[in-house]
Swiss-Prot record:
Function according to Swiss-Prot or TrEMBL: Catalyzes the conversion of pppGpp to ppGpp. Guanosine pentaphosphate (pppGpp) is a cytoplasmic signaling molecule which together with ppGpp controls the 'stringent response', an adaptive process that allows bacteria to respond to amino acid starvation, resulting in the coordinated regulation of numerous cellular activities.
Keywords: Hydrolase
GO molecular function, one term: guanosine-5'-triphosphate,3'-diphosphate diphosphatase activity
Enzyme Commission number: 3.6.1.40
Enzyme class: hydrolase
Xref: CDD domains: ASKHA_NBD_EcGppA-like
The protein's name: Guanosine-5'-triphosphate,3'-diphosphate pyrophosphatase
Species of the source: Citrobacter koseri (strain ATCC BAA-895 / CDC 4225-83 / SGSC4696)
UniProt family annotation: Belongs to the GppA/Ppx family. GppA subfamily.
Record's catalysed reaction(s): guanosine 3'-diphosphate 5'-triphosphate + H2O = guanosine 3',5'-bis(diphosphate) + phosphate + H(+)
Gene3D superfamilies to which the protein is assigned, alphabetical: 3.30.420.40, Exopolyphosphatase. Domain 2, Hypothetical protein af1432
Pfam family membership, one: Ppx-GppA
Length: 494
């Protein structure tokens, strides 16, 4: 039963948007129940004396009246409300906060830039997979947080006075999207970054993760345009040229960019280009969570799981009553196959991880029905919350599960953008073979199999006499060989 004691709420009064996240604690992880976001653009109401206008304050209070209704069902100790950059700056912040507390019926805490950076990092550490040593970037409305860390521990924290709303007001006042506007915005951002760049570089990182609306917008653009999800400087420069070509902010049209995000997109883009250039970032991906998730996990006192993806897979297996022994059996066999062909097929470590994940989830469709189980599995993966996996990785997993058996839908493997199409094909082939040879659901009945790859030709060698003694197995592998040949995947079985 859902009781109010299992509910938690985190509210972030940001400089661009106000956000509310309501979650339920379920077996050591969180289940999102409500997410509300309203563009309040508080920072746009700051004048040259750092005084908030009455209109901006009213926009904020109006939004909080919406939030207040949802908070009535949640115990006050389980509500955390924080205010960030604009309310750190505003000389009349006290007036805004007093009324905000009255509306919400709970305290509002103005947090320091360093505390904001720490919470953002915690949110990322709890929800984002990948290497342990990371750089986290969050471009807010009036401040930008940059944090390095390993696992759950931060190694450096910086909160800088630049954001997509303040940069919009300062460098795109006339709403022109000219090269000069971008040049000035980038130059100013690099000057703000310069004093902290050495310290960040000293700590180093293996992966760079973006946790802001700007990065979310970039992700949406790249998914809509069929690009892979990695953000690179070349892609950012390409989007800048597109924006310049549009000429004015009100004319800005980029496939995948929503109207809601368009206003602060150019200013956020300029800041991000400056960060990439100044810190020599090669590639960035989108974080699974940030400030609000950091607040929630902080209230719950949950430890950071060393492997977020594994935790996610375990939770889903439990929820859909997956036969975990069989899932591990298929995964072990698929990894054994991958070990034999990875050099010839040039498969990277992430391919191994994604193949294993697909194996762990391949039978979740059975919880709906045996009929069309692959379609059910794909639907579930597409629509479940999978902390630790990026949107593109979710799409790849769903596509692999859709193609785990029966005729192969090659176009779906080519439409995902987590890995190159050829790699998706290779992973699909290995998954399908592992499922066939583990189908008896007993370790002692899995034969010794040798796989050899030569370009797209796959040669599968079985123990002598195995095919004669296993007529059903032979039928399955003959059918598989035929299905693979339909999509020009030669499979020879000996």
């Amino acid at each position: 039963m859902l009781t109010s004691t299992s509910l938690y709420a985190a509210i972030d009064l940001g400089s661009n948007s106000f956000h509310m996240l309501v979650v339920r604690e379920v077996a050591g992880s969180i289940q999102t129940l409500t997410r509300i976001k309203r563009k309040v653009r508080l920072a746009a109401g700051l004048n040259s004396d750092n005084s908030l206008s009455a209109e901006a304050m009213e926009r904020g209070w109006q939004c909080l009246r919406l939030f207040a209704e949802r908070l009535q069902d949640i115990p006050q100790p389980q509500i955390c409300v924080v205010a960030t950059a604009t309310l750190r700056l505003a000389v009349n912040a006290g007036e805004f906060i007093a009324k905000a507390q009255e509306i919400l019926g709970c305290p509002v805490q103005v947090i320091s830039g360093e505390e904001e950076a720490r919470l953002i990092y915690q949110g990322v550490a709890h929800t984002t997979g990948g290497a342990d040593q990371r750089l986290v970037v969050d471009i807010g409305g009036a401040s930008t947080e940059l944090v390095t860390g390993t696992g759950a521990q931060t190694t450096s924290l910086f909160s800088l006075s630049m954001g997509c709303v303040t940069w919009l007001e300062r460098y795109f006042t006339d709403r022109n999207l000219a090269q000069e506007n971008f040049d000035e915005a980038e130059k100013a951002a690099r000057e703000v970054l310069r004093p902290v760049a050495d310290e960040l570089r000293k700590h180093g990182w293996k992966v760079c993760v973006g946790a802001s609306g700007t990065v979310q917008a970039l992700q949406e653009i790249m998914m809509a345009q069929g690009m892979d999800e990695r953000i690179t400087l070349a892609k950012l420069q390409q989007l800048k040229q597109r924006a310049i070509h549009c000429g004015r902010l009100e004319e800005l049209e980029i496939e995948g960019l929503t109207l809601e995000r368009a206003l602060v997109f150019p200013s956020g883009l300029a800041i991000l280009i400056a960060i990439f250039t100044e810190l020599d970032i090669q590639c960035m991906t989108l974080a699974g969570g940030a400030l609000r998730e950091g607040l929630v996990y902080g209230m719950l006192h949950l430890a950071v799981d060393q492997d977020i993806r594994s935790r996610t897979l375990r939770n889903i297996q439990r929820r859909f009553m997956v036969d975990t022994e069989q899932a591990h059996r298929v995964a072990d066999l698929a990894v054994n196959f991958l070990d034999q062909v990875e050099d010839k097929w040039h498969l990277e470590p992430i391919s191994r991880e994604l193949l294993t994940s697909a194996c762990q989830l391949h039978e979740i469709g059975l919880s709906v029905d045996f009929k069309q189980a692959p379609q059910h599995a794909a639907y579930l993966v597409r629509n479940l919350d999978l902390p630790g996996f990026t949107p593109a990785q979710k799409k790849l997993l769903a596509t692999l599960l859709l193609n785990q058996t029966n005729p192969i839908d090659l176009s779906s493997l080519h439409q995902q953008n987590a890995v190159p199409p050829r790699v998706a094909e290779h992973l699909c082939r290995l998954l399908r073979l592992a499922i066939i040879f583990a189908s008896r659901r007993r370790d002692d009945l899995v034969p010794q199999i040798t796989l050899q790859a030569q370009d797209e030709n796959l040669t599968l060698t079985l123990p002598q006499g195995w095919l004669e003694h296993h007529p059903l197995g032979k039928e399955l592998i003959d059918q598989e060989s035929q299905w693979q040949s339909y999509v020009h995947w030669p499979l020879d079985v000996h």
